[in-house]
């Protein structure tokens, strides 16, 4: 028999295609490379809009790294990342908790100069070294520089 059409086609509401087409599941955004002992976090295009989003990030990173039983270095891609302003403090607090528990050194990158500045300032306020770069190669090199 033929496949049924998506019922959203007939509804008088947005279809939610943005979510279906653009959202990458959090678990697919996280990858540990055992050979290099580096954890890669791909937040490209990620939108943090609720406290639940922050909790989901914390839980996913902890689930990926806790089994290692030690801290690792990390590289985080923040290209096209967005966060609602009222959640920045909670987000940075979550980042600090993850760093304390799971990371030696973290480098971050985004081509967005405003985001580098904004998140960088918030991280530095909490005595978290920002290590924010404009490109992936600079961030990778930042791991190798003491």
Predicted regions and their residues:
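Amphipathic, Lys/Arg-enriched alpha-helical "gate/interface" segment within cytosolic domains
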Residues: 1-146
């Amino acid at each position: 028999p033929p496949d049924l059409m998506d019922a959203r086609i007939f509804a008088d509401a947005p279809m939610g295609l943005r979510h279906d087409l653009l959202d990458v599941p959090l678990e697919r955004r996280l990858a540990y490379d055992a050979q290099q002992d580096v954890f890669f976090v791909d937040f490209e295009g990620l939108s943090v809009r609720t406290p639940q989003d922050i909790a989901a990030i914390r839980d996913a990173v902890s689930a990926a790294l806790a089994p290692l039983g030690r801290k690792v270095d990390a590289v985080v891609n923040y290209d096209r990342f967005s966060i609602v302003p009222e959640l920045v403090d909670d987000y940075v607090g979550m980042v600090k908790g993850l760093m304390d528990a799971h990371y030696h050194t973290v480098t971050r990158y985004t081509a967005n100069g405003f985001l580098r500045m904004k998140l960088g300032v918030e991280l530095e306020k909490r005595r978290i070294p920002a290590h924010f770069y404009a490109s992936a190669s600079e961030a990778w090199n930042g791991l190798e520089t003491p």
